[in-house]
Structure formats: C-alpha cells, structure tokens
C-alpha cells in the first residue's frame, strides 16, 4: 500500500518559542504564503503555548493570536489553517473565536497522563465540524501502554488523530516505535496517528521516519526546524527523505528550502540547533520550551544552563511549571554558597 502523508507545519506555533513569541503579522503572512505555495497540508498558528498562551509565565507575545491567525487566513489558498489549545490556558470561547477566523483544524494538547482534561474541548471542536487531533505532550514520560491508554481516551472523546508528542526531544527510535505500535494496538483503524518530534538528540528526522514506517500518517515539521529547544523536525530534510522513500505528499522540496533560508532563518535571534544547552534538554528529558527560561535564569544567577536543566529533569517538571525554573536556580545558588562556606 502506498504511504500518503499529511504534512503539518508548526513554524508559526512551536517556532514562536524560538523567537520568544515575537513576530509581526506581516512576517506571518509571508511565511504562510510561502508554505501554502510549497504545498504543505496544514499550517499551525498561535502563541508557542497555544491560544491565550501569552502571559508573564509563558512569555507575552508581540501580537495577539487573533492578529497572527488573521494574517495567516489572508494568505491561504489550500492549506488547512490549524491552531493548538491547552485546556486550562485556552478556553472554549477562544476555540470558537478561532473557528470564526477561519481555523478548521485544532490540536488539543495535554500532559501525557492527563488526557481526561481534553474531553470538553475535543467535543466542542467536533461539534463545530473541525478536524481534531489529540496531542499527548512529553510522551517519553509515560510507558507505551500508559500512553496508548491516554490516546484511547482522546479517541473516545472524538479525536480524529492522536499524536506521539516528543516535547522534550527525549525519545529514541525504539521509544517512538514502541509507542506508535502501542497506539495501533488499541486505536480504531480509522483513527490516524501523528508524530511531533524535536531535534534535541539529533533524532527528529529519524524518529519521524520510524514513525511513518510504523503507520503514522501525520508528521509535524517546521521550516529550518524552527521550534523550541533545538527545534522541530526540519521539514526540508524530512521531505527529501520522504521523496527517497517513495512516500506520497504534496510538498515542494525546493520551495520549502527557499522559505527556510530566505524567510525563517533571518528571524532567529538565537540559532535553532543542537548545542550544549539544547542537547541537555533531550539528555535530561526537559520540555523544549524551557530553554529560553533556563537561559534567562542562568544569566541572572550565574548558574550553568546545563546544571539548571539537569535539575529540572531530575524534578520532572512539565509544561506550565516555567516559574519553578527560577526557584531551581536559587536552590542551586544556595547549595553552591553552602559548599563554598563549608
């Protein structure tokens, strides 16, 4: 059977973390137009932490979600306008307003063990006639069987697709393979499976390829890998591999390369790449969007970013606990002072 992929671009949602949620609607429009012309199937637009994510805790955006989404809608001809919502941050009212602005696909995201909080939002999105995916973040923190049980819950609420979401870039190929197989064992045949990979261990393309080999049909990727931490699966090399594998998709490789180099890389105030800090995210299994918060704490308190991230991983922090990074830095500073004093 021929493998056909749905390529979901996340440059303008996960990629918001890479620019601290600061991008003009004009730039959003240019990137969306380029992605649409390049043939991607879906384009996700929102604050990095989803609808209503702009806050002191997560980081304020330069513009509202609505300004970004309107700019995107004005530049679409065929791609599915998508957004992301975390219950407890985004509300039903915001979901409904996104629909009014033209969003027709939504990913409802929860921590990997908290699928039950997604029921209302998935139900409302289905009621509106939207395409709905469940997004189980930090998927490495649950065993394959536990994660699959959570995926089954999202399916029961009405999700058309459920993702293995490697928010920390911690999964290896075997970890992805085991989780996709566990999903397939419990989900209905009609329910799609998606993969959302991060590059922190330099495995995002490999993990996405393994996922497709195991039956995944929806693949998240971004221009130049633009995303939290070391970035997401870079769309250009993934599409190149998909071509070599003979997988069917609608994307134009050269057009994606041009958009990545001409439009996205110039926006990055910090290179999106594997380096000592971003590698530590994957090594410690830390939520990728914690990078900029940890770097700010490091600069303020003089603690190595890697030391902070290792402690974040040891304590098992999850999305929404960004404020505890400062507490961790202060604890480490106090421990260093005690060590020097003794």
From Swiss-Prot:
Binding residues annotated for substrate, in chain numbering: 13-14, 167, 196, 287
Entry's family note: Belongs to the 4-hydroxy-2-oxovalerate aldolase family.
SUPFAM superfamilies in the record: Aldolase, post-HMGL domain-like
GO MF annotation: an example: 4-hydroxy-2-oxovalerate aldolase activity
EC id: 4.1.3.39
Transmembrane segments: none
Chemical reaction(s) catalysed: (S)-4-hydroxy-2-oxopentanoate = acetaldehyde + pyruvate
Residues at which Mn(2+) binds: 14, 196, 198
Originating organism: Rhodococcus jostii (strain RHA1)
Stored InterPro entries: 2-IPM_HCS-like, 4OH_2_O-val_aldolase, Aldolase_TIM, DmpG_comm, DRE_TIM_HOA, PYR_CT
Protein name: 4-hydroxy-2-oxovalerate aldolase 5
Active-site residue numbers: 17 (proton acceptor)
Top-level class of the enzyme under EC nomenclature: lyase
Keywords: Aromatic hydrocarbons catabolism, Lyase, Manganese, Metal-binding, Plasmid
Site (Transition state stabilizer): 13
């Amino acid at each position: 059977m021929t493998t056909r992929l749905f390529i979901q671009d996340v440059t303008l949602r996960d990629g918001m973390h890479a620019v601290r949620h600061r991008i003009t609607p004009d730039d959003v429009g240019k990137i969306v137009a380029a992605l649409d012309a390049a043939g991607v199937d879906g384009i996700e637009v929102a604050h990095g932490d989803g609808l209503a994510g702009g806050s002191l805790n997560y980081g304020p955006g330069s513009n509202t979600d609505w300004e970004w989404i309107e700019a995107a809608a004005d530049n679409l001809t065929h791609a599915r306008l998508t957004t992301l919502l975390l219950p407890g941050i985004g509300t039903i009212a915001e979901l409904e307003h996104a629909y009014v602005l033209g969003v027709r696909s939504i990913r409802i995201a929860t921590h990997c063990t908290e699928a039950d909080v997604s029921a209302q939002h998935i139900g409302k999105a289905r009621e509106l006639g939207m395409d709905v995916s469940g997004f189980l973040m930090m998927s490495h923190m649950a065993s394959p069987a536990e994660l699959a049980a959570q995926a089954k819950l999202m399916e029961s609420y009405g999700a058309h697709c459920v993702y293995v979401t490697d928010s920390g870039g911690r999964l290896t190929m075997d970890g992805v393979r085991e989780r996709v197989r566990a999903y397939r064992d419990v989900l209905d045949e009609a329910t799609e499976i998606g993969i959302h990979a991060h590059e922190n261990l330099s495995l995002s393309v490999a993990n996405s390829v393994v996922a497709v080999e195991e039956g995944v049909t929806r693949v998240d990727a971004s221009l130049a890998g633009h995303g939290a931490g070391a970035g997401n699966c870079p769309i250009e090399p993934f599409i190149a591999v998909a071509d070599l594998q003979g997988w069917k998709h609608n994307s134009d490789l050269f057009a994606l390369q041009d958009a990545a180099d001409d439009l996205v890389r110039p926006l990055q105030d910090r290179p999106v790449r594997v380096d000592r800090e971003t590698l530590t995210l994957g090594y410690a299994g830390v939520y990728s969007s914690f990078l900029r918060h940890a770097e700010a704490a490091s600069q303020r308190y003089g603690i190595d970013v890697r030391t902070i991230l290792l402690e974040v991983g040891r304590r098992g922090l999850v999305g929404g606990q960004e404020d505890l990074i400062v507490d961790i830095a202060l604890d480490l500073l106090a421990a260093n002072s005690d060590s020097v004093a003794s």
